[in-house]
Amino acid sequence: MDKITYAYLETTNYCNLDCSFCNRDEVIGSLKHMSLDDWGKLLDGIKHHPIQEAKLMGMGEPMLHPQFDEVCRMFKEVFPKCKLIVATNCQYNINDKFRECMKYIDMLYFSIDGYKESYERDRSPAKWSKLLKFLEQFKSVDRYDCDVVVNYVVNAYNVQDIRKVDKLRKENNLGQLRLNIAQIWDADIKMSDDIATSGYTEKDLNYLRDNWNEQIMGKSKWDFKDCFWVNNAIYTTVEGNIKMCCMNTGAEPFGNLFENSIDEIRLMDDYQNVKKGCQTNNPTSHCQNCSYKELVPILNYVGV
């Protein structure tokens, strides 16, 4: 069995925003913060895998977990050499627990999608003024060795805001600008059915290609057989449920880490069927509307 080298682990599904490209209301269960006891059990259940990179995020704002500093510390205790990544929406006041988290996080994404009006539209009820206040507070935070970057989800309505946000990034001494073309996380909806994810004008695409192609994340040469999720990754929800990837958050779980081991779950028929479908470029219904696959022509056009 292939070893897991990448983990996407959700420790809370609480969130203070209702972003336009997030389907959390359709897929989450009861609001929950994972207990430190359960978090310890989860880590114990996957510690035999050589995880090299992990993202502590999911359908919630990670920093809303009341013990997220301990969550990060415990993870690094089990996986000291693993690159730990966290994304935050910056819509809160920085406190001592946030400052403590910085000791353990290797890369921190500040999610800033758009400028002023478009930011508040797509990340409602976020306020631009709150973001600016957060950035001002962050100036006094010890970053330790954490690489703090800007993550920008590009859609058909905020393409022209990129340069303004890049200026804000530089003014606040932040790292790389990471542009992610917006995707659909619902397997029942195609990107082509949504104007925000498919309505780019030729002018927009040319602008992205000519000015920002080095900042755009993703691979233009990709097919189902290239999917790393089915071979080397794990996606867990706050309940401990195992799903295949973050592109299909609405899928039925393959199992639960608090009921079966991760290795047992990955050997189950349903899991293996999805894996084999990707490996043979004959995807099952689970992957038929994969938004990453739909993204390939756009990434190819903009020269990624």
Which sequence ranges carry the predicted segments?
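N-terminal pre-triad scaffold of radical SAM enzymes
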Residues: 1-21, 51-57, 231-240
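Radical SAM enzyme [4Fe-4S]-AdoMet core and its adjacent flexible, acidic
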Residues: 10, 25, 29-34, 44, ...
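Local cysteine-cluster metal-coordination motifs and their immediate loop/turn environment
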Residues: 16-24, 244-247, 283-294
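Short beta->alpha connector loops
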Residues: 88-94, 154-158
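SEC14/CRAL-TRIO lipid-binding/transfer domains and related phosphoinositide-recognition modules
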Residues: 7, 11-12, 34-38, 42, ...
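Glycine-rich beta-strand-to-loop/alpha-helix junction loops that act as flexible
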Residues: 56-60, 87-89
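Active-site-adjacent beta->alpha loops and helix N-cap segments on the catalytic face
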Residues: 65
